[in-house]
Amino acid sequence: MAGKRTRKINEGVDPTKLYALTQAIGMVKERAVAKFDETIEVSMNLGVDPRHADQMVRGVVNLPNGTGRTVRVAVFARGAKADEAKAAGADVVGAEDLVEIVQGGKIEFDRCIATPDMMPLVGRLGKVLGPRGMMPNPKVGTVTMDVAGAVKASKGGAVEFRVEKAGIVHAGIGKASFDAKALEENIRAFADAVIKAKPAGAKGNYVKRVAISSTMGPGVKIEVGSVTAAPTA
């Protein structure tokens, strides 16, 4: 039964062909037939080797149409900054007490923000938050004194990205229920951010391949030039 369903979903998708972005979005949306609102993910293969420090790609992008998911935000802060975080809508706010909770294995948040003075304390959580990609980092705006702005950005569609070992960077950029225009705008915003994050050590062709897929659907390869007009080399 599952095999038949998979074959039917895959019908019409040529794994050797590159599709225009708008066509690819339509194909992915048509095949997102699960009983839940599937996440649409974009994947980019980059011409970098992240084992070298000068070829690391990472950053954050605010998607114009949000991600469609509820993001739970934790903030490490004290005093007025803790109050600011709560007023901005942070789900969890604390200092030493929150560190103890996280060390105990209770992680009820998706994104973590800290004020700079809290980092010596938060640094103890590296082994817990690091592997989950949740360690606060000034490069992506999660170590900041503007906690209200960071909380609102996180809840409003901010997406962090970081290249993996094979030179791949990917992210969920929306839901199957989004209209095609919203998905296109989000994909272009993500691709633009990745291109702007091109490291000094990257040589030759930077964006090699781009593909999109839904949670349960097949990957659809896209013509790189149809995703962004920015140079890919």
UniProtKB/Swiss-Prot annotation:
One Gene Ontology biological process: regulation of translation
GO cellular component: cytosolic large ribosomal subunit
Superkingdom as given in the UniProt entry: Bacteria
A family per Pfam: Ribosomal_L1
Keywords for the protein's UniProt record, in alphabetical order: Repressor, Ribonucleoprotein, Ribosomal protein, RNA-binding, rRNA-binding, Translation regulation, tRNA-binding
InterPro entries named among the record's database cross-references: Ribosom_uL1_bac-type (IPR005878), Ribosomal_uL1 (IPR002143), Ribosomal_uL1-like (IPR023674), Ribosomal_uL1/biogenesis (IPR028364), Ribosomal_uL1_3-a/b-sand (IPR016095), Ribosomal_uL1_CS (IPR023673)
PROSITE patterns attached to this UniProt entry: RIBOSOMAL_L1
Disulfide partners: none
A molecular function (GO) term: rRNA binding
Subunit structure: Part of the 50S ribosomal subunit.
Family stated for the protein in its record: Belongs to the universal ribosomal protein uL1 family.
Physiological role: Binds directly to 23S rRNA. The L1 stalk is quite mobile in the ribosome, and is involved in E site tRNA release.
Cited NCBIfam families: rplA_bact
HAMAP family: Ribosomal_uL1_B (MF_01318_B)
Protein name, entry field: Large ribosomal subunit protein uL1
